Amino acid sequence: MNSPQETPTLACADAWFATNVQRCPRSAEWKHGARAGCFKAHGLAFERSPWPSGTAQDDARNAGFQYGYEQAKHDLKAEGAL
């Protein structure tokens, strides 16, 4: 269960993901990573990669993670949240 302090942040992270990633034509693995990266940028715990290291799925997840983290962090800075 999320603490009361995390709830607004979780809602913000989910809203960012829904707006920027959810409907893009990327793989499920990439989207999984983008969501994890977004969570990290918002200061939340994120899920590790469930795929073995070096697989195409893990590579896609890592690329998504990088995008999600960098873009969400950029957007948070632009909004003055960081």
PLM segments and residue spans:
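Intrinsic-disorder/low-complexity detector
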Residues: M1-L82
